[in-house]
Amino acid sequence: MALYMYQASYTAKSMAAQLKEPQDPVEAIRSALEDVGAELVVTGFPFGEYDVLVVYEAPDDVTAASVAMAVAAAGEVKSAKTTRMLSGQEWLESLRKRRVVHSRNAP
């Protein structure tokens, strides 16, 4: 499965609702991901540009796109981005492939 990082900023309305009735959203996030065949790796709540960060594994980019669309449609976030991440093994493989590309294109 591929690894993805999802970052989002809550709307003022969503943040106000959370302040009024604090709830742990991790289980809801986990359940939503599992519904589409994805698996939660870690969730964090940074302060700064984004309010929530979710790292998850999904079978493909289409699944990751469906997660982002579902969150956007719920209207709870004002901005978000999904980043496809390489695993350590994928990173190493890309470094090795780069040598092949470089050697073929070297002057």
What residue ranges belong to the model's regions?
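Residue-level "edge-of-site" marker
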Residues: P46, R84-M85
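Short S/T/G/P-rich N-terminal loop/turn motif that feeds into the first structured element of a domain
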Residues: M1-E34, E39, Y50, Q89-P107
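Surface-exposed beta-strand edges and their flanking turn/coil or helix-capping segments
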Residues: L19-E21, V55-Y56, V67-M69, T82, ...
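Short, well-ordered beta-strand segments in beta-rich or mixed alpha/beta enzyme
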Residues: Y4-S9, G44-V67
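An amphipathic, aromatic/His-enriched active-site/gating alpha helix that lines ligand/cofactor pockets
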Residues: A58-R84
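A short linear hydrophobic-aromatic micro-motif
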Residues: G37-G44, S79-K81
